[in-house]
C-alpha cells in the first residue's frame, strides 16, 4: 500500500528533499501539475501537461508540493504506466514543443528519450531541481535516459507497453493494451484514462484485467490525488523515507540491486533510508519512485489479482510469468512493505495507511466499478459510477447525512462526527485530519473521514477475530461490492500479509469498514449518546467482557452480539436507561431482563460486591430522596454499565441464562471481573451514598435484594438483554436463588441495584417504602406506627416490591415470603410492645382486654393464616409441588391477609391512642364533657345523655372509621404503588431491553 502511495509520494519525496523543494517552485513542475489538474484530457495530465505549454501562471497556482507531487505523480505514474500516452516512441519533444523554451530545455535534459508510456515529469522536476543544484544536464539526461530504458524494459516485460497494445498478453496487459494503444492513441487513451473508469476502461479493469496498469493507476491517482500524496503517506513524507529508501534500493535498477533490496538488510536500510544523503540525484529519486511505482503498481496488481492468500505464491506465479520483472517487482514490493511495516508504528499509522491505500485503490480501481470514495464532482473522476455504488451508499449512511454530492458534511454532522470520533478514537480523528485536512478536497476529506470513521467503528464494533480478511473477501456482501473493490481489498489483504500481523488486523478492519454491511450501525450518535459512550468507554475498554460474555445469544442488539462490548459502546445508549419506563411491552421480558440484569449486576456486585456491597446492602435502604436522586443516576449509570458491560453480562446471562437459579451467581463471576472494574466505583459511591442516606426499611429488602423494582431496574438494564431471553419464570426463582447462593455478591448487587434500580423502577414504591420500612423496622412496634398503618403497609408492599424486584418484580413465593416475614416481625413487635406495656403499666381492665384481644388476634393470624401463606409460598418455590400455586394465587391470598392485617392494625392503633392517653379510656372524657353542656338546658337534659352517649359512640366510631379509612387508603396506595412499581419495573426492564435493542 505504501508502495502505491509511495509512488505518489515519490514526487513528494523529491519535492520534500531540500534539494528538490525548489523543483516545486519551478514553472516546469508547476505547469505539469497544473496541466494535469486543469486539463481533463490526457493532455491535462501532468503527462500531457508536459506536452502542453506550461504557463507561469499555472505554475504559480500549483507551486505547492501537492502540485509538484501531482506532476511527479503523473509522470511517475505515466512512466510507470504501460499506457502509451506519449506513445512508446513519442518523444518528450512533443510535449516539449508546447512548453516554453526553458521548459523544453529542461525536458530535453530530462526527457531525452521518448516516454514510451513513461512520464518523466518527476524526472524533469528532479532534473530541474538538480540543475538548480548545479547537477549537469548531461548527467541528469543520462540518468533519465537510463531510467526510461529500464522502465521500458520492465514494462515490456510486463507486456503493458500500452502504447504498443500488446499489453493484453502481459499480466497487466489487459489494461495495458487498452492503455497501451499506439502512441497516437495515447492522447486518446490519456483522456480515456478518465473515461476509462466511466466506460471502456472498466472492462480493462475488470477482474480479468484486474491488474491496474501503473499508468492507469498513476493517471487516476494523479487525477484523484492532486494534493493527497502526502495523505497517502499518512502524513509521513515519503519523499525522504521512501525516496531515500527507494534510492538505496534502486540506485541501480538491476537484478543485483533488486536482490539487494529484497534482502532483509537492504529492506531495513530502505526503512532507514531517511539517513540517505540528500545529495542523491533527484533523477535517482525519480527513478526509484517512478520505477517502484510502475513495478509496484503493475506488479502489485498482478500479485494481488492472484488473490492468493500467500503473497509468496502470488509472487512466484508472477515470477513464473516474468522472471526478471517479477523479481524486480518482488524486491520493490518487499521494500515497500518493509517501509510500510516500519511506518506502521501504531494503529493510527496503520489505519492511515489503510485509508490511503483504500483511497488510492479507489482512484486506481476502475471507477465505474468503484462505488466508494467518490471524489467531489469538482474533481474530475473518470468514473462517475463511484458516486452511486452500493459501497458509496454504505459510506453515505456511515457518514450519516454526508451525501456524496455534498462537498462537505453539515456542521451538525461534522460536530457529531467529531464528537463520535473523539469518544471512540481521537487518534483516528487526528490521523484523519492529518491525512485528509490539507491535501484532499473537501469531498475527499469527507470520504476519508467516513472511511476512517468506518474503519474506526469497525475496529470498535467488531472483534478482531471476526474480521478475517479472507472471510470478509469471501463473504457475499463483500463480493456484492464491486469486483474492482474486491481487487482493491484483495490487494490490501495481500499487503497486509506482506506487512504481517502489524497490518493484518488493521487491514481486515479496513476491509470490513469498507464493506460495512451494517452502515447504520456506524451512524453518528447524538451527543448524549456520545457522552454516554465516553462514560462507558473506560468500562467498555475492559475487553475481558468480550471473552467473559458467552456467545451473544439472541440479544436484541445485533451490534452488541457482533461486537459485544465495543459494539455495546456504540450500540448501547447510556443516556436512555435513565428514562426508565420507555415502554413496558413485555413484563416477562422485564422479568427476564431483570434476571439478566441481575446477572450483569451480580457480576458487577460479585466483583464490586466484595467491595463491601453486602454490608452497604444490608445497611442500604433506598431512602425516598436517595432513591429518587439515585434513581436517575443509578438508572443511567447502571443502565450504561449494564449496557456497556451488560452486553457481556447479557450475553453471559443469555447464553448461561443468568436468570437460572444457580447460574446467576456464576454468571456474575464471569462478568463481574470485567464489569465491576468500570461500574464499581460509580455504583459503589452511589450505593454508599444511598446506604448512608439511610433506610433500613430497604435494609430488609436489600437483604432480599431490596425492592424488587430496585433489583429489577438494576437487572432491568442487563435484564434488557435477558429480557430477550424472556425467562421470567426462571428469573423470579433464579434471582432469589441467586441472591441466596450469591448472597454476599448478589445481595450487594441487589442492594445496590435496589438503591439504583428501585429508584427508577420502584420509584413511588421505594419512596414510601424507604420511609415506611425504615419506620417500622426502626420502631419495631412503636405505637406511633399503629396510627399510620399505612407506613407498615407501604413498607410491606415496598418489601414485597423489593422482593418482586429482586425476583424481577415478579411476585413469587420468595417475594411473598419476604413480605410475610416483614409483616410477621412487625406484628410480633407490636405484641411484645403491648405485653411489655401491660406489665409495666397499670391499666383498666377495658384497656387490658383490648391489648389482649389485639395481641391474641395478631398471634392467631400469624400462627394460622401466616403459616398457611408461608406454606403456599414454599410450595410455589418448590418446582416439584404438584398443586404448585402460582404467583397470582399467592397475591390473592396475600390480599386476603391484608384485610386481617388491617383489622389487627386498627386494634393496635387504638391501643396506641390509649397509650398516648396514659391508658385511660378515650370515651369517658368525651361523655363527661358532653354531659356538662346538657345540664345547662334543663329540658333537653333527658334527651342529652343519650345524645352524649351517641356522640361519644359516634366519635369512637368515627375514629375507628377514620383509622379504617386510613388503613384502606394506605392499602390502596400500597397496592397502587406496588402495581405501578411492578408495572414500571416491567416497563423499565422492557425499556432497557428496547434501548439495547434499539442500539
Swiss-Prot record:
GO MF assignments: molecular adaptor activity
Broad class of the protein's primary localization: membrane
Subcellular location: Cell membrane; Postsynaptic density; Synapse
Stretches that traverse the bilayer: none
Region entry Disordered, spans: 155-213, 395-418, 918-989
Compositional bias per record (Basic and acidic residues), positions renumbered to this chain: 194-204, 923-932, 947-965
Sequence motif: PDZ-binding, positions: 997-999
Stretches with biased composition (Polar residues): 976-985
Keywords recorded for this protein, A-Z: Cell membrane, Membrane, Synapse
InterPro entries: SAPAP (IPR005026)
Cystine residue pairs: none
Membrane topology term: Peripheral membrane protein
Any one Gene Ontology cellular component term annotated for this protein: postsynaptic density
Domain of life, source organism: Eukaryota
A GO BP entry: signaling
Family the UniProt entry places it in: Belongs to the SAPAP family.
Role summary: Part of the postsynaptic scaffold in neuronal cells.
Protein's name according to its UniProt entry: Disks large-associated protein 1
Name of the coding gene: dlgap1
